[in-house]
């Protein structure tokens, strides 16, 4: 008996069928053939097969099927080797596999991600956020929290937690929703797995919330389109600038779900649905001054929308779902309208053409197509149609003949803020503005004017007007803030 127990192994036998998986306890083939007749006869007297031994202190995994349970004892002649492979493995239903889930259910509800993917999602989530209170609290018991989150996802017990709502006032009052840190890890987990298959189908002219496609990419892309259609500013052309009305709070979740289902399925679709249809208004904490919420227009508040509409601004999942939704619009404009010169950044889009009549026809087509297919509409107050020679204002930059400059409103705000803000915040803010101004092709004069403001406040500027330094007095006595 001791010898048989030592040679037995717990082996998972994967059935070659699309119907079920069966786990059996079988011996190694090379050692099962060496069983003696006496041992087999002794086991028969105990009423069980000589090819199976019970493993002491070994419990199978959840869902495993042990073929030794509920088996009738039958007489085995001495010297005849028996095997648990007597149970037929095939497409024919068998009693021993009745508790195993079907392949369709297993494929749909099985969480097919690794723990390494969850760890990578955690690192992606904490990037630039490690000093936040929620990230620090999660990291205090990092291993335990990650293991608990992994178990919840694997067992289907995960539920989104409380969100935080606050209001920003620059450039205009807007609601911002921040999910709990552990929920943001799940957002990154979903994003890391499914985003590549969607990005592969996106057009090259869609920007925002796509790796390598920020505001600078959008400005350069539009500038290249203008140079192409005008033959390096030698021919006239017109542009049509469109904006979607109340975009994020008007998104129909059912439309997004139907677009997601075209490329993902199973457990990942279930997780995407759970994140998509979660209503943060059911459990949230309002931070900041409550009266600021009244400054947000009612039609732009998520709290004023029906349950099936609106995505919380601030979550990675919302930005990704918005790109999935508007990819349908991109495909319609590029292939339906056959618009060759087109660029979109979130809900702002620019169409270029030689004929203003063609652009008016395209505008009418888009106005009719959006409500029917996506449940969205255009903002008529932000629709612009004029020659490109007058300048195209897009993603904070103005593209004019042979130059690209920073929007005047942004530059004037930079001068005003750096001249009035506290000294302890000036160093970081000024360098941020220098980096923003450098994105334009013609920005030397603007950077020089910003540098003059900083020099008057005691800061040193490099000769190319690309960055500022703290003055020598700010280092005395370890005081980095007082100038």
Placement of each model-derived feature along the sequence:
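Active-site-proximal segment of RNA-dependent polymerases
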Residues: 105-108, 191-252
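A common structural junction motif
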Residues: 264, 367-376
């Amino acid at each position: 008996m001791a010898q048989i127990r030592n040679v037995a192994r717990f082996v998972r036998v994967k059935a070659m069928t699309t119907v079920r998986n069966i786990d059996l306890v079988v011996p190694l083939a090379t050692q099962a053939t060496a069983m003696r007749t006496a041992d087999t006869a002794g086991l028969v007297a105990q009423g069980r097969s000589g090819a199976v031994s019970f493993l002491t202190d070994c419990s199978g995994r959840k869902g495993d099927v042990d073929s030794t349970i509920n088996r009738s004892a039958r007489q085995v002649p001495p010297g005849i080797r028996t095997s648990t492979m007597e149970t037929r493995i095939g497409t024919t239903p068998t009693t021993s596999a009745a508790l195993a889930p079907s392949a369709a259910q297993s494929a749909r509800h099985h969480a097919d991600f690794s723990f390494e993917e969850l760890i990578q999602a955690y690192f992606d989530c904490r990037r630039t956020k490690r000093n936040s209170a929620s990230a620090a609290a999660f990291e205090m018991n990092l291993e335990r929290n990650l293991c608990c989150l992994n178990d919840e996802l694997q067992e289907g017990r995960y539920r989104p937690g409380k969100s935080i709502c606050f209001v920003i006032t620059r450039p205009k009052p807007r609601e911002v929703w921040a999910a709990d840190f552990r929920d943001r890890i799940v957002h990154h987990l979903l994003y890391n797995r499914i985003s590549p298959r969607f990005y592969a189908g996106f057009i090259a002219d869609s920007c925002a919330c796509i790796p390598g496609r920020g505001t600078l990419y959008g400005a350069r892309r539009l500038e290249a389109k203008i140079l192409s259609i005008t033959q390096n500013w030698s021919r006239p052309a017109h542009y049509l600038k469109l904006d979607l009305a109340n975009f994020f709070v008007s998104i129909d979740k059912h439309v997004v779900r139907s677009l997601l289902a075209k490329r993902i399925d199973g457990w990942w679709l279930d997780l995407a649905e759970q994140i998509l249809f979660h209503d943060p208004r059911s459990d949230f904490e309002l931070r900041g001054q409550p009266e600021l919420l009244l400054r947000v227009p009612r039609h732009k508040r998520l709290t004023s929308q029906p349950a099936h509409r609106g995505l919380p601004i601030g979550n990675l999942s919302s930005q990704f779902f918005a790109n999935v939704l508007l990819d349908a619009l991109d495909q319609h404009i590029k292939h339906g309208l056959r618009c060759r010169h087109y660029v979109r950044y979130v809900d702002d889009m620019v169409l270029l053409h030689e004929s203003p009549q063609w652009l008016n026809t395209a505008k009418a087509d888009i106005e009719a197509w959006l409500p029917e297919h996506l449940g969205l509409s255009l903002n008529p107050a932000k629709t612009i149609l004029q020659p490109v020679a007058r300048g195209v204002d897009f993603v904070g930059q103005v593209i004019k003949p042979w130059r690209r400059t920073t929007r005047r409103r942004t530059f004037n705000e930079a001068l005003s803020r750096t001249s009035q803000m506290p000294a302890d915040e000036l160093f970081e803010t000024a360098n941020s503005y220098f980096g923003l101004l450098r994105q334009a092709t013609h920005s030397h004069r603007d950077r020089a004017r910003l540098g003059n403001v900083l020099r008057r406040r005691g800061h040193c500027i490099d000769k190319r007007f690309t960055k500022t330094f703290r003055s020598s007095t700010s280092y005395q006595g370890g005081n980095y803030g007082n100038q």
